[in-house]
Amino acid sequence: MNNYFSMEAFDYDDIQLVPNKAIVKSRKECVTSVKFGNRTFKIPVVPANMESVIDEKLAVWLAQNGYYYVMHRFQPEKRADFIKMMHEKGLFASISVGIKDDEYDFIDELVEKDLIPEYTTIDVAHGHSVYVIDMIKYIKEKMPDTFLTAGNVATPEAVRELENAGADATKVGVGPGKACITKLKTGFGTGGWQLAALRMCSKVARKPLIADGGIRHNGDIAKSVRFGASMVMIGSMLAGHEESPGNVIKIDGKTYKQYWGSASEVQKGAYRNVEGKQMLVPYRGSIANTLEEMKEDLQSSISYAGGRDLESIKRVDYVIVKNTIMNGDY
């Protein structure tokens, strides 16, 4: 048993960050930008690469406005055309791939057509796998210039192995998301200790980590940064917007949009190996407003951390308060 697992387990609602002396007059002085790969983005936030969160139209808007994105892989036949379309618009292309045999043919097709995406994400529920490692090696051999993220994982050992195989970043989180029921269906995952898993993985990581899942409040973004995340992947909080995929549904005068997990019945089209669920999320208006609010709250986090940029958050102290911070507020 690795001694990392002797650490106390905790999650986002169990932690409060401790303020430092402020050095800015206004939070507007605080810089939230982050370099990821060869590009710098406005905030360390990326919408989940789920079919109910992102589509081509939203990907274009995000790239045009300085945000990172990862296109989902659930319409595989459209990916090459998507890369071509983004490049023709002068935008970066960021795609997802799996590990099935035909994905190797897809990589070969991209090389043959000279359609190399700037970012590629190997998107597998259990990313600590010999097949993921094989795919990492293949992609880095065929497309050495693509910035390659691999995941998802839960342990320091997994981070080490994927990095050693050639991954440029690793995605941490197995089943903590709102629409994911892996923890209930299988008994495995980081649900309830996602933040502790991130902390453990950051102890050994030599390359960037993406915290994926379990984000419920904007303050959780700052907590993710404190415990080692370079980027924070968010699903349910970035679903339900005007630009989001999914049908608009009205119930008792209230407006909702559909949101579903990537291994749900909706996604799979049949009841088989289901580890996700469908739900309704409140309609939230424009995603631009939500992303701006996330930026402003993160600026406030930086000011509380006593700094001017995200690095200051990584140095603050924290206390474990075990589910008392909500104090009936939510």
UniProtKB/Swiss-Prot annotation:
Entry annotated with the keyword Amino-acid biosynthesis: no
Gene Ontology CC terms: cytosol; GMP reductase complex
Q: What is any one GO biological process for this UniProt entry?
A: purine nucleotide metabolic process
Where does the signal sequence lie? none
Specify which residues bind NADP(+) according to the UniProt entry for this protein: 209-232
Active-site residues, record numbering mapped to chain: 180 (thioimidate intermediate)
Q: Which Pfam families match?
A: IMPDH
Read off the PANTHER family from this record: GMP REDUCTASE
> What's this protein's function?
Catalyzes the irreversible NADPH-dependent deamination of GMP to IMP. It functions in the conversion of nucleobase, nucleoside and nucleotide derivatives of G to A nucleotides, and in maintaining the intracellular balance of A and G nucleotides.
| Similarity field | Belongs to the IMPDH/GMPR family. GuaC type 2 subfamily.
What name is this protein filed under?
Answer: GMP reductase
Gene that this polypeptide is encoded by: guaC
